[in-house]
Amino acid sequence: MFGYVRPSLAKLSEEDTARFGAAYCGLCRVLGERYGLAARMILNYDFTFLSILLWPQEEPEELQKNCIAHPFRKRDYYPGNPALELAADESVILAWWQIQDALSDPGKGKAKYHAAALGLKGAYREARERRSAFDAVTREQLERLRRLEEDKCPSLDEPADAFAKLLAAAAGEAGDPVKRRVLEQLLYHLGRWIYLVDAADDLEDDFTSGSYNPLIYRYGLQSGELTGEAREGLVVSLDHSIRLMAAAFELWDFGVWKNIIQATVYEGLFLVGRAVLEGTFQSNDMAFRITGRNKEQL
């Protein structure tokens, strides 16, 4: 999974920070309730953000409870609802197919992926039954990605489009048709942004292992570092996707979630993208972590 989609902490009030934390903990609980303890390991900020996009506009009910990760202090969380359930189901499906893709990649170690597949097999079967349409799109687009990788596709747009269409499919169950169209556009460009940021983040490892990375073939890179031309071109592409996300965001009233989404689209993505390009995101990950109401990092 990725974990790149995070709001800017500087732009969030204490109330909104706590609200995001309660959604994150709520998603963790729903994953555990629907799919067991192993499924909680795939929890990330990206699908928390998806649940927020799908959430109704009004303030949700907030509860407090201890959990296995924090047994000595109660954590605020939102109980299960359709938005959290959808995010949980689709995160299981995407995680499963990403694991299968990793197992088919000759450039990666297999032991941890075999273990992950074993832990998620039952969960995936249940999630597939619940979200068959999303599962079908995920399989189709990841297979398309696999073919592009085999062909050493030199385009950034083609593989990014495959992942973008995959994520846009998550909007399919939004009830309101106008909101569905808004989310399709927002999630499409978010998916495109995630794919390209992940390619930049993996560049050094992919170059060393000989794994496919579209940046290597698009810019003819001779090392695991971006040239000035490649960096400039990638920044333009990433910024373009963010601007289109912002345009979609402005077309819908997201109610109590507006500030969190705004802090993500208008600043959080820029900050994460910059950190990835500077090579500081992985080493400084804690600086991007969200804190709950009790000031504990999520």
Put a short name on every predicted segment.
Residues 285:
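N-terminal phosphate/diphosphate-binding loop that engages ATP/GTP or pyrophosphate donors
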Residues 1-185, 192, 196-231, 235-239, ...:
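Acidic catalytic motifs of isoprenoid enzymes
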Residues 262-267:
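A glycine-rich phosphate-binding loop feature that marks nucleotide/adenosyl-phosphate handling sites
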Residues 288-298:
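Long, low-complexity, intrinsically disordered segments
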